[in-house]
């Protein structure tokens, strides 16, 4: 019985940057570090930071004036930022640079009064933050989730129209939505390359490859992790038995019955230690062969943190 690891898997550059910002802030400041929303969507990571004294809040109003706040990797709306400034908070922005790029484009559309369409999942913090970059009352930003939303969409002025996407969507589904938009609105413009990030793309491509050489796939990632959920959905679409788990304790032995090759991947916010624990658990259950890593993309992207947060080792 074999264990095959997807490549790439686990932390992306945006998550690594966000974690480094908080870890360094804990070393530099002698005050409580507050984080608006979960820094990244992984319960293990959040609990680890909580044990170090980090306080997570959903409402910026719950943070005392003159405190230190970290904006999560998902980004925040302009309103949240204004509230933080009004409370005289020291802002440490851990927003993923790829999300910031989308924010800047949406803000530009807003400034120019161009109606804008955002493809994304309703209620996701990244989507809330991105929609919150559009504040021109003369224009409008529309959120769509699927092709049915495209069919029902009504635009006042479609001579100039822009679209953008959440960074953690299914590539396949998003491409079909974009095609539907371009078919309905001939003058629509979008980014040269869709906003889905490199890490999301690489992990989705990897799970497709993994599905061809395994008969079960375990996706490690929290339930509220968008990119992990997309990986799980994609694994199921390939026809391979796929389960999304938070940790090794979620694994049921019945899943492994008559399985010879078990594939493991992890969402962009899931740490390596969770993968290691799953491997250790599987070995106890009979998967004795050393795990093999499949061939895949080598990720070399690094996002720098603010200079004032650099810590000398």
Curated annotation (Swiss-Prot):
<feature type="binding site">
    <location>
        <position position="269"/>
    </location>
    <ligand>
        <name>isopentenyl diphosphate</name>
    </ligand>
</feature>
<dbReference type="GO" id="GO:0050992">
    <property type="term" value="P:dimethylallyl diphosphate biosynthetic process"/>
</dbReference>
<feature type="binding site">
    <location>
        <position position="225"/>
    </location>
    <ligand>
        <name>isopentenyl diphosphate</name>
    </ligand>
</feature>
<feature type="binding site">
    <location>
        <position position="74"/>
    </location>
    <ligand>
        <name>isopentenyl diphosphate</name>
    </ligand>
</feature>
<dbReference type="GO" id="GO:0046872">
    <property type="term" value="F:metal ion binding"/>
</dbReference>
<dbReference type="Pfam" id="PF02401">
    <property type="entry name" value="LYTB"/>
</dbReference>
<feature type="binding site">
    <location>
        <position position="74"/>
    </location>
    <ligand>
        <name>dimethylallyl diphosphate</name>
    </ligand>
</feature>
<feature type="binding site">
    <location>
        <position position="41"/>
    </location>
    <ligand>
        <name>dimethylallyl diphosphate</name>
    </ligand>
</feature>
<keyword id="KW-0479">Metal-binding</keyword>
<feature type="binding site">
    <location>
        <position position="225"/>
    </location>
    <ligand>
        <name>(2E)-4-hydroxy-3-methylbut-2-enyl diphosphate</name>
    </ligand>
</feature>
<feature type="binding site">
    <location>
        <position position="124"/>
    </location>
    <ligand>
        <name>(2E)-4-hydroxy-3-methylbut-2-enyl diphosphate</name>
    </ligand>
</feature>
<dbReference type="GO" id="GO:0019288">
    <property type="term" value="P:isopentenyl diphosphate biosynthetic process, methylerythritol 4-phosphate pathway"/>
</dbReference>
<feature type="binding site">
    <location>
        <position position="41"/>
    </location>
    <ligand>
        <name>(2E)-4-hydroxy-3-methylbut-2-enyl diphosphate</name>
    </ligand>
</feature>
<feature type="binding site">
    <location>
        <position position="12"/>
    </location>
    <ligand>
        <name>[4Fe-4S] cluster</name>
    </ligand>
</feature>
<feature type="binding site">
    <location>
        <position position="226"/>
    </location>
    <ligand>
        <name>(2E)-4-hydroxy-3-methylbut-2-enyl diphosphate</name>
    </ligand>
</feature>
<feature type="binding site">
    <location>
        <position position="269"/>
    </location>
    <ligand>
        <name>dimethylallyl diphosphate</name>
    </ligand>
</feature>
<dbReference type="GO" id="GO:0051745">
    <property type="term" value="F:4-hydroxy-3-methylbut-2-enyl diphosphate reductase activity"/>
</dbReference>
<comment type="pathway">
    <text>Isoprenoid biosynthesis; dimethylallyl diphosphate biosynthesis; dimethylallyl diphosphate from (2E)-4-hydroxy-3-methylbutenyl diphosphate: step 1/1.</text>
</comment>
<feature type="binding site">
    <location>
        <position position="226"/>
    </location>
    <ligand>
        <name>dimethylallyl diphosphate</name>
    </ligand>
</feature>
<feature type="binding site">
    <location>
        <position position="167"/>
    </location>
    <ligand>
        <name>(2E)-4-hydroxy-3-methylbut-2-enyl diphosphate</name>
    </ligand>
</feature>
<keyword id="KW-0414">Isoprene biosynthesis</keyword>
<feature type="binding site">
    <location>
        <position position="225"/>
    </location>
    <ligand>
        <name>dimethylallyl diphosphate</name>
    </ligand>
</feature>
<comment type="subunit">
    <text>Homodimer.</text>
</comment>
<feature type="binding site">
    <location>
        <position position="124"/>
    </location>
    <ligand>
        <name>dimethylallyl diphosphate</name>
    </ligand>
</feature>
<feature type="binding site">
    <location>
        <position position="226"/>
    </location>
    <ligand>
        <name>isopentenyl diphosphate</name>
    </ligand>
</feature>
<feature type="binding site">
    <location>
        <position position="74"/>
    </location>
    <ligand>
        <name>(2E)-4-hydroxy-3-methylbut-2-enyl diphosphate</name>
    </ligand>
</feature>
<protein>
    <recommendedName>
        <fullName>4-hydroxy-3-methylbut-2-enyl diphosphate reductase</fullName>
        <ecNumber>1.17.7.4</ecNumber>
    </recommendedName>
</protein>
<feature type="binding site">
    <location>
        <position position="227"/>
    </location>
    <ligand>
        <name>dimethylallyl diphosphate</name>
    </ligand>
</feature>
<comment type="similarity">
    <text>Belongs to the IspH family.</text>
</comment>
<feature type="binding site">
    <location>
        <position position="96"/>
    </location>
    <ligand>
        <name>[4Fe-4S] cluster</name>
    </ligand>
</feature>
<dbReference type="InterPro" id="IPR003451">
    <property type="entry name" value="LytB/IspH"/>
</dbReference>
<keyword id="KW-0560">Oxidoreductase</keyword>
<keyword id="KW-0408">Iron</keyword>
<feature type="binding site">
    <location>
        <position position="41"/>
    </location>
    <ligand>
        <name>isopentenyl diphosphate</name>
    </ligand>
</feature>
<feature type="binding site">
    <location>
        <position position="227"/>
    </location>
    <ligand>
        <name>(2E)-4-hydroxy-3-methylbut-2-enyl diphosphate</name>
    </ligand>
</feature>
<comment type="function">
    <text>Catalyzes the conversion of 1-hydroxy-2-methyl-2-(E)-butenyl 4-diphosphate (HMBPP) into a mixture of isopentenyl diphosphate (IPP) and dimethylallyl diphosphate (DMAPP). Acts in the terminal step of the DOXP/MEP pathway for isoprenoid precursor biosynthesis.</text>
</comment>
<keyword id="KW-0004">4Fe-4S</keyword>
<feature type="binding site">
    <location>
        <position position="227"/>
    </location>
    <ligand>
        <name>isopentenyl diphosphate</name>
    </ligand>
</feature>
<feature type="active site" description="Proton donor">
    <location>
        <position position="126"/>
    </location>
</feature>
<comment type="pathway">
    <text>Isoprenoid biosynthesis; isopentenyl diphosphate biosynthesis via DXP pathway; isopentenyl diphosphate from 1-deoxy-D-xylulose 5-phosphate: step 6/6.</text>
</comment>
<dbReference type="GO" id="GO:0051539">
    <property type="term" value="F:4 iron, 4 sulfur cluster binding"/>
</dbReference>
<dbReference type="GO" id="GO:0016114">
    <property type="term" value="P:terpenoid biosynthetic process"/>
</dbReference>
């Amino acid at each position: 019985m074999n264990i095959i690891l997807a490549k790439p898997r686990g932390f992306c550059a945006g998550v690594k940057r966000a974690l480094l910002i908080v870890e360094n802030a804990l070393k530099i400041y002698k005050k409580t570090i507050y984080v608006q929303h979960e820094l990244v969507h992984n319960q293990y990571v959040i609990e680890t930071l909580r044990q170090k004294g980090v306080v997570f809040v959903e409402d910026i109003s719950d943070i005392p004036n003159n405190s230190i706040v970290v904006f999560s990797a998902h980004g925040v709306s302009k309103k949240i930022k204004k509230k933080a400034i009004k409370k005289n908070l020291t802002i440490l922005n851990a927003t993923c640079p790829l999300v910031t790029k989308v924010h800047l484009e949406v803000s530009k559309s807003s400034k120019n009064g161009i109606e804008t369409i955002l493809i994304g999942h309703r209620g996701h913090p990244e989507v809330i933050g991105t929609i919150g970059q559009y504040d021109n009352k003369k224009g409008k930003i529309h959120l769509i989730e699927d092709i049915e939303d495209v069919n029902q969409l009504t635009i006042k002025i479609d001579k100039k129209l822009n679209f953008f996407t959440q960074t953690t969507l299914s590539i396949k589904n998003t491409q079909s939505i974009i095609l539907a938009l371009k078919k309905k609105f001939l003058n629509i413009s979008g980014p040269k390359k869709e906003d889905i990030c490199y890490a999301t793309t690489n992990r989705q491509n990897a799970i497709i490859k993994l599905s061809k050489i395994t008969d079960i796939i375990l996706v490690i990632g929290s339930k509220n992790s968008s990119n992990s959920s997309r990986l799980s959905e994609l694994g199921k679409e390939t026809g391979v038995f796929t389960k999304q788990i938070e940790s090794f304790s979620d694994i049921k032995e019945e899943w492994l019955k008559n399985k010879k090759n078990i594939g493991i991947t992890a969402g962009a916010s899931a740490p390596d230690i969770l993968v290691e624990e799953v491997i250790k658990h599987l070995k106890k259950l009979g998967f004795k062969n050393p795990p093999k890593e499949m061939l895949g993309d080598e990720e070399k992207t690094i996002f720098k943190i603010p200079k004032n947060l650099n810590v000398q080792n």
